[in-house]
Structures are given as structure tokens and as C-alpha cells.
């Protein structure tokens, strides 16, 4: 188990090895909900879900961090960025570091984000997305490519896989709070450094980049936290915290 999970968690340690595999450069600011979690370096992604709150993966937890919004080229100041520190970082109470179940956390910002054409929130789901729905995953994670400019936000279109295909890919490891997306033949996937980032389907945040076996490997699609199952906790926490 640890060897499987360790592959994705490398992104939180080796910040230079960051990007999406088999994707393309996102249209600039088309993913205006995408944020970078920073602790002196980019270590995970996240999604702005209101002017005060960001959703990310629980395995990306740090007690204090800085959220960078409005980014495209992560190493260049383009004049669109907002840098806001966290006031609270809250993991799902049933998150398990053993099997990465309920891999979601909320970050409350010390001040509201300014919403504009470069920074805006993504909607939370009111229902789960159907199998085969095409979604966009984005991030500054490992491209495993010498051609792709991974300092610029990368995007990838992926279909949601059936629970059966997901469970067959990872026997005994998939819970009701997880889903798989991608291609069983491999070649396209999220990777190290993308953890915590968004999976957006028809304008709705359906997934959080969580774990997988390697990156873009055959019969091992990416595994994502299933936001539609976890959104009750997200909404309750934002309302009551």
C-alpha cells in the first residue's frame, strides 16, 4: 500500500517534478478556480469554491500554507495573481492516511479572494456525474515530457470510469468516496504535484486529485476523491466554521 501511495505523494516533496501527463497547456485563465498551495514552493493544487474557501486533498495537509490564485505561469509574475495565507486548514474527520479514504480538506483564507476574470469559484456538486462523463483535470504536476512547458498550467480531458473498471484496476482499494478517471490503455493522467487539484465536469467540481499507481500507466487510472459524496461535509464546514 505504501509503495502505491508514495508515488503520488512525491509531488509534495519534490516540487521540481511537477506536471500533467499527455495533456495540453490550458487556455490562459480558463481554469480560474485552480489554485496553487505554496510553502516556499508549489506542492499541491486546489480549487476555489467560494471567496473564502479552497478545497484540496487531505494528504496535502500543512497547518499553515499560502494559496496562490490567478496563476498561469507559475514562475512568472503576470499581474493577475493573488497571494492569500490560510487561517484554518481542516481535514475531513474520517480521512485515512492508510488507504487515502475521504481525501479532502478545506482551507479558509485569511481574507476573501477578489473574484474577477482571473479568479473565480467553481460550483460544488448537487449530484454525482455519470460514468463516461468527460471532465477536465488541471495542475502544475509532472508532465514526464521534455516538450511540455509544465510551468504553465496543464489541462487534460478524461472520462469518468465505471466503479467496476476502477475496482478491477485497484482490487480491494476503492471506497465509495473514490472514483477513477482516465484511460485504461494509459498515456494520459494526473501525476505528482497535481494532488489536491480539480476534476471539473460540466462546470462542477466532481473530483480532487488523490492517488494512483505511477502516472499514466496501463490499467492504472488516476484515483480521485468523490466530491459529490463528500460535499455535505464541505458545505456544513463552510457554513458553521
Curated annotation (Swiss-Prot):
An example molecular function term from Gene Ontology annotations: serine-type endopeptidase activity
Domain Peptidase S1: 20-239
Proregion residues excised on maturation: 14-19
The EC number(s) this enzyme carries: 3.4.21.4
Annotated catalysed reactions: Preferential cleavage: Arg-|-Xaa, Lys-|-Xaa
Record InterPro entries: Peptidase_S1_PA, Peptidase_S1_PA_chymotrypsin, Peptidase_S1A, Serine_Proteases_S1, Trypsin_dom, TRYPSIN_HIS, TRYPSIN_SER
UniProt site positions, description: Required for specificity: 189
Subcellular location: Secreted, Extracellular space
Transmembrane segments: none
Signal peptide: 1-13
Active site feature: 59, 103, 195
Positions of disulphide bridges: 26-155, 44-60, 128-228, 135-201, 166-180, 191-215
Protein name per UniProt: Trypsin-1
Species for this entry: Gadus morhua (Atlantic cod)
Amino acid at each position: 500500500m505504501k509503495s502505491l501511495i508514495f508515488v503520488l505523494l512525491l509531488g509534495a516533496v519534490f516540487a521540481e517534478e511537477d506536471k500533467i501527463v499527455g495533456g495540453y497547456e490550458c487556455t490562459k485563465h480558463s481554469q480560474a478556480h485552480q489554485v496553487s498551495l505554496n510553502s516556499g514552493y508549489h506542492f499541491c493544487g486546489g480549487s476555489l469554491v467560494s471567496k473564502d474557501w479552497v478545497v484540496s486533498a487531505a494528504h496535502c495537509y500543512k497547518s499553515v500554507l499560502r494559496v496562490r490564485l490567478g496563476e498561469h505561469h507559475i514562475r512568472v509574475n503576470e499581474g493577475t495573481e493573488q497571494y492569500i495565507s490560510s487561517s484554518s486548514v481542516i481535514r475531513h474527520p474520517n480521512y485515512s492516511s492508510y488507504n487515502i479514504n475521504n481525501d479532502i480538506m478545506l482551507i479558509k483564507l485569511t481574507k476573501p479572494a477578489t473574484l474577477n476574470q482571473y479568479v473565480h469559484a467553481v460550483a460544488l456538486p448537487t449530484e454525482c456525474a455519470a460514468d463516461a462523463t468527460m471532465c477536465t483535470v488541471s495542475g502544475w504536476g509532472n508532465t514526464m515530457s521534455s516538450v511540455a512547458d509544465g510551468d504553465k498550467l496543464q489541462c487534460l480531458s478524461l472520462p469518468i470510469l465505471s466503479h467496476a473498471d476502477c475496482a478491477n484496476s485497484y482490487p480491494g482499494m476503492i471506497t465509495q468516496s473514490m472514483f477513477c478517471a482516465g484511460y485504461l490503455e494509459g498515456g494520459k493522467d494526473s501525476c505528482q504535484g497535481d494532488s489536491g487539484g480539480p476534476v471539473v465536469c460540466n462546470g462542477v467540481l466532481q473530483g480532487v486529485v488523490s492517488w494512483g499507481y505511477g502516472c499514466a500507466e496501463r490499467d492504472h487510472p488516476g484515483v480521485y476523491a468523490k466530491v459529490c459524496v463528500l460535499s455535505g461535509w464541505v458545505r456544513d464546514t463552510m457554513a458553521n466554521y
